Amino acid sequence: MANTEAWTVHLRGCLFSFHKELIVLLMQLNQWITRAMGLLLLTSLVTSVYGQNTGSLTGRIVEEGNGAPVIGVTVTLQKHNRILVTDEVGRFSTANLGSGAETLLISGAGYAGKEIKIEIPIGGVLDLGDLPIQPTQLQDYQAYVGVVNDLEINESGDTQAVSTSVIVSNDVYLKNSGYQFSQFRHRTRGYDSRYEQRYINGISFNEQVRGVFNYSSIGALNDLTRNGNRINYLGASDFSFGDIGGSENINMRPSTYRRGGKVTLSGANRNYYLRGMASYNSGLLDNGWAFTSLLGGRYAYEGVVEGTFYKNISYALGAEKQWDNGTHSVSFITFGSPVERAQQGSSVQQAVDLVGCSTYNPNWGWQNGKKRNARVVKSWDPTAILSYVFAPNKETTWTTGLGVHYNRYGRSGLNWYNGADPRPDYYRYLPNYFEGQPFMQKYYTYLWQTGQISQIDWDRLYNTNHINNISGDGSAIYMVEERRSDLFESALNSTYTTRLNDHVKLSAGMGYKYSLSRQFKTVDDLLGANYLLDVDKFAERDFPGDQTTIQNDLNRPGRRVYEGDVFGYDYRYYLHSLDAWVQQEHNYHYIDLYYGSRIALNTLQRNGLMRNGRYPDSSFGKGDVHTFVTFDAKAGITYKINGRHLITANASVQSRPPLAYHLYVSPDITDNVVPSIKSSKNANIDLNYIFSTPKVNGRIGLFYTTFWDDMDKAAYYNDVQRTFVFHTLYDLEKVHRGIEVGINWAPTSALNFDFIGTAAQYYYNNNPMGVMNSTNGNVVNQEERALMKDLYIGGVPQVLGTIGINYFINYWFLSLNVNGFGMNHIDPAPIRRLASNYSQVLSQEAIDRLPEGPGRADAQKKHDAYKLMTTQERFASGCTMDLSIGKIIYLPGRQQINFNASVQNLLNKRDIRTGGYEQGRINLLYPENFGNKHFYMQGINFFINASYLF
């Protein structure tokens, strides 16, 4: 690392190191923001009228029939060439307008366009009241949030594999791709979910440990998460600096909800079969109070994937008080969505072929006549938010909020000690393992096809432990553990927005977040054993007779643990972040532009509660505090050819601290970190043509994003070292580039067509360094370059498209989509790209020079295995078809019944691979034993939703 001057500061016993130049910059920026915000607030309090000879305009866009506010609709003033967007209550407003005739162009994705002729007065305010627009689609994308995301969380639960917006975007491409492409595990521009920011009532809810928003925290709360703002990509925002994947602010303030109640009942054949919600909102009462409440849940005794189940209940309560004509508002809301669900596992192709089912799930087996799943997730994320909004005039808003939540997250899994592998698809139990033994191959094929060994044999596990209780020492050979990743997090955010003059708007904000993450595992079920010995099974094998190295906790050697006890590992993460950002927007007749910057201070520390025998000096107690100062900048410009045609360009440079999981090489057992500690960086640029005519509207965009100094981590069993290893890549470079097209053509008021697609490349752009560390202590900081350059980012299609036909008549809605996809690749394992694993492999030219015989055959087999194991698998392209139908029935007294049903994969294609990963085990003589593991698209599936509003 460079020898730059640093400051050392002692704060309550903790040691922090800061780069001097960056700290000075942070202090100067904070002082400037504080002074500017104070001055601007004072100015806004005493000046709220900008001119005597100009007029102002305000109005509210509502849905025809029920009067519900429509968020994110574009309102264009054609003569003034000014573009407005409706806020979370459907309202738009602007000032300093020249008097005379004007034409309003109203457009929103999923709504019929509308033109309104108005006359702007000289001075005063023209209030247009409620302006109804007609929906052209009833496909309730927001209702699908829980359906999409719960299936797409990977096996470890560390990352969410798709991008799904809670707030529907007004952008034609984003509105359709978020749901329509979710079945293919689409991610916005291929970005990880941590590049999308989620806020609730102005509070940041991207957790600091994983960097993502926890969608399960709002499961079955769909009716309370519809309102809010969405910023497409890294555009101008008044609640956040934003991120390259976009940002959302879910508005849960009770006063923003439609007065009345709603009862919703949904059915599906996916991860759950039944969902119900009942909510009631008081609206804003005459005394300034507003209240909201919701109770919901989701359930499946067995989901569409065999051996899975789903149990969930959700709740929300909120209250708000406004006074002084809405100048002041204080709101409080609390919600939660505890869930217990069984997971599906991936498997190799041979196992899938043997059972004849693409959704084969190796995670379950029979026990006492009932199906039992070994991998069960239990999660609960109770949340409370207190928010204060001060709006002294129409041009100024100051929002401050405090959010607190605690996430209890655990996932169970089988563990074993001195016993045969209990997983049914373990490579030794597959016919391929018995190469050259035709009888054994036929025998194991028969066992698989008759279902005798295709699932977990729970009875055998219990019997093995029972025998050891009688004739052995009574310790568990097989058991179920629960791996816990609990999180307590508190966040404080304050944002300020004001209009400085006719053309300039200023937004600024500050935020602080504290996170305490508890990482440990407990004994969930001893499966009939008396106890479990808390030692490392790999270390005991590799260090026989060494009673020190094998201990998981030297402070309590030879410890026996029982159900509910913590064992194996136990440590904490302490994370602090402080950030400040400022942004300015300029609006002129032909040009709009914005620019902004953000600076952040982040600290991370690990505290080990066990002294591990493999790392006795670096596992126990508090480790070093790692400090990162990051800086972001963004800018964008819009050229308004006229009110219907725009050209936009956006650019940004960002940096962010590494995730805790990436920074520590083996966090379960040591405080050691990667050799090169850097903040990851990215630079982004995009160019868009946006158009909105009476018949056609949409966007065509180009984007290019490059990442460098990034990190990634994989964990797998290493056959060479015969132990479990963590493999961390650092100094990683990636490129995401492509084109996006979203076009809606409405030849008539009843018929419109969607043309949505993206063609992109997401790939690794260098050969990063990697460092491996084993859990048994045999491998310590083993470094080698991984040959990843030009491999594709796995698990996300790089070419996607859909053509949709939407028909609307008398509040009946019918949609048909034909989807195409391609260029989807397996997630590559870095260990397969280490040259040291293939030191015995000869080139084809060298093999051709060898004499015929066993030696040449063996060399050819190794060479073929090398090519197989280093070639990235590309999944087959394909197409699917989706159908949806809906109906709105309006009743007297603003009552309403909604019905919508959708069917995905109407052609029932079950052979479509949507994702998967390469195994980390390498065997050059028998590579077929360690084939890739895949996920497949479910066959035909449906979602039915009915709701009654009163």
Name these PLM-found stretches.
Residues 56, 267-300, 304-344, 376, ...:
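Transmembrane beta-barrel wall of Gram-negative outer-membrane proteins
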Residues 165, 172-174, 203-234, 251-253, ...:
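Short acidic/polar hinge/loop motifs at secondary-structure boundaries
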Residues 320, 329-387, 410-481, 545-562, ...:
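Acidic/polar loop-and-plug regions of large Gram-negative outer-membrane beta-barrel proteins
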Residues 340, 346-347, 550, 555-560, ...:
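Surface-exposed extracellular loop regions of Gram-negative outer-membrane beta-barrel proteins
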Residues 361-383, 387, 623-632, 655-708, ...:
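Outer-membrane beta-barrel signature, preferentially recognizing the C-terminal barrel domain
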Residues 479, 505-642, 769:
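Signature of Gram-negative outer-membrane beta-barrel scaffolds
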Residues 704-706, 727-832, 947-949:
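Gram-negative outer-membrane beta-barrel transporters
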Residues 753, 820-861, 887-950:
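C-terminal beta-signal and adjacent terminal beta-strands/loops
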